[in-house]
Structures are given as structure tokens and as C-alpha cells.
């Protein structure tokens, strides 16, 4: 219901803040669920790791979360495939370098990037610095880890210039 309301607010008022909150809530629940499912699939031999079980689990979680988030947005009439403010697993260009490169956050809602991960990340992590270098210049990167991992499972990294 809250997610629906956030979608209506986006359509009518153009305000992305409620959708940012609901995206976080939804992605956290999906990451938790996909973590349990992924572990069960690995134990049953239905997911074959290339390098490690951890890599296979992370890839499984990413795919599941992105698929479910796309479906959720689609069911609410929110386009995630174009160049709009809501995107799922889309290239975000970095054109400030000599040649254009890109980063691919799991999701983006306006100026917030979302990254689902098994590992803790900081501003020193190349991927996070890369997100901040993208042309859409996010104000924050939300790190979402399955709660089953314990500790700091979800947190926000603020753009460095905004801390001043």
C-alpha cells in the first residue's frame, strides 16, 4: 500500500522521496528473501558456483532482487528502462573522463543509488566512488545487505562534498 502511494505521489507531484523510502524497504525484504533462497539452492546443487559459493550467492541475490524490483515498478506503472529518474540495473555514464565509462547500480531513484551486496563497502571502495562520479551525481548510495549477515546490514554513504 505504501509503495502504491509512493508511485501515485511520483506521478502526480513528481516527488521521488516517498519512492526512495519504499524502494529501500522493498529491496531490503527482497535481499533477505533471496539470501535464504540462494543458500537453499546452493546446498541443493541448483546453483553452480564458478569461483566460490559466496560469488554464486551474490549473483543469485542480485538477479532476484532486480527482477522483483522491476516487476514491482512495472505493476505500479513506473518505467525503469529509459532515461528517467527511476532505473533498475542501467548504465550510468561517467563522461568526465577522457573516454566515457559507466557504473551500473542495482537501482536508482532520482539522486539515490542502491547497491545490494554481501560485502561491506565504504567511500574508499572503487565501485562506490564510481557511483558518485556518474553523470547523475547521486547525493547518496544506499548499501543494502541481507539482514542475516548481522552487523551493519544496511547503511547510507553520503556524497563527500555534502558532508561539509
Language model segments and positions:
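Catalytic toxin/effector domains delivered as secreted proteins or via bacterial secretion systems
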Residues: 3-164
Amino acid at each position: 500500500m505504501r509503495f502504491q502511494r509512493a508511485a501515485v505521489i511520483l506521478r502526480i507531484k513528481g516527488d521521488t522521496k516517498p519512492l526512495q523510502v519504499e524502494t529501500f524497504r522493498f529491496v531490503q525484504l527482497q535481499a533477505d528473501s533471496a539470501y535464504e533462497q540462494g543458500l537453499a539452492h546452493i546446498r541443493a546443487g541448483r546453483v553452480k558456483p564458478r569461483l566460490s559459493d559466496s560469488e554464486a550467492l551474490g549473483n543469485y541475490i542480485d538477479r532476484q532482487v532486480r527482477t522483483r524490483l522491476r516487476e514491482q515498478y512495472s505493476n505500479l506503472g513506473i518505467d525503469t528502462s529509459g532515461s528517467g529518474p527511476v532505473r533498475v540495473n542501467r548504465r550510468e555514464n561517467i563522461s568526465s573522463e577522457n573516454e566515457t565509462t559507466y557504473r551500473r547500480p542495482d537501482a536508482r531513484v532520482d539522486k539515490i543509488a542502491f547497491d545490494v551486496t554481501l560485502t561491506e563497502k565504504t567511500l574508499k571502495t572503487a565501485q562506490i566512488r564510481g557511483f558518485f562520479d556518474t553523470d547523475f551525481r547521486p547525493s547518496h548510495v544506499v548499501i543494502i545487505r541481507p539482514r542475516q549477515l548481522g552487523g551493519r546490514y544496511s547503511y547510507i554513504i553520503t556524497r563527500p562534498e555534502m558532508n561539509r
